[in-house]
Structures are given as C-alpha cells and as structure tokens.
C-alpha cells in the first residue's frame, strides 16, 4: 500500500498524477479532486526492474531507487525490497518479485541503484 495525494488530472489522456515520498505515479483518471489523499495497492509482481535509466518504452511510471534487501521467495523467484526515491531523501519501501534468472542476468545486489517500472494499469485504488 502506498499513500499518495492527487496533484493533477490530465483530461485529454484521462490520467491522474499522484505524489508520494518515492516520486510521482500516473494512473487512469480518478474522479476525485486535486489534494485528495489516495491509497494505492501495488503488487510485487507488477514491478519490473532496470539497472539503467530506461528509454523507449510504454511504461508511464519509472521511479528511481535502490535495493534494500533481496531474498529467495519461491522456486526460481527473488523478492526485492526496494527503497524508492532519491538517495539521501526519505522514500517509500515497496517489494518487487522477479525471476532468479532476471536477478542473475542483471547482477542485482543489495545497495545497487535501480529504476522500478510500473504499468499505470497495474495501480489499484484502495478505499
């Protein structure tokens, strides 16, 4: 669960922008006024990881952060605990689950900087 606040609506693209300690998120338009606090549910399986700033993709939410912890969470699966936000600033902790193969190919390790990619359609409003 991520606590956010609505900061903007884009009526042309029917999107809402929300702010939180880890950055900004865009999602399908919410029919709530600017300034409204919104709790979002973000599933670990809905977060992809990049080790360099990604370019040329359709993902609307790309958030900088670092790997706080990582552990095996099932056969062939690794769960990463991520701290989203700029280094040295308060951030937001989320979890991402990726394959062990992906973690190995990316040479992921604790403390490394990452970019979390989150599809807008993966965000769900928690009332």
Outline where the language-model segments fall:
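Internal alpha/beta loop-helix hairpins
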Residues: 1-25, 44-45, 50
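Short, solvent-exposed loop/turn segments that connect beta-strands within catalytic domains
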Residues: 12-13, 87-91
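Short aromatic-glycine-enriched beta-strand elements
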Residues: 12-17, 73-82
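Short strand-coil-strand connectors
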Residues: 19-21, 83-87
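Glycine/charge-rich catalytic "coupling/switch" loops of P-loop NTPases
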Residues: 22-72, 89-92, 97-127
């Amino acid at each position: 669960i991520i606590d956010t606040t609505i900061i903007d609506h884009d009526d042309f693209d029917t999107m809402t922008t929300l702010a939180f300690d880890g950055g900004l998120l865009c999602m399908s338009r919410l029919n709530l006024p600017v300034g409204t606090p919104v709790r979002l549910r973000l599933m670990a399986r809905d977060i992809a990881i990049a080790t360099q700033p990604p370019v040329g993709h359709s993902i609307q939410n790309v958030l900088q952060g670092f790997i706080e912890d990582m552990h095996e969470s099932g056969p062939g699966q690794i769960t990463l605990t991520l701290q989203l936000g700029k280094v040295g600033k308060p951030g937001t902790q989320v979890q991402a689950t990726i394959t062990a193969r992906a973690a190995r190919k990316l040479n992921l390790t604790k403390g490394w900087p990452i970019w979390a990619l989150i599809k807008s359609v993966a965000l769900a409003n928690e009332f």
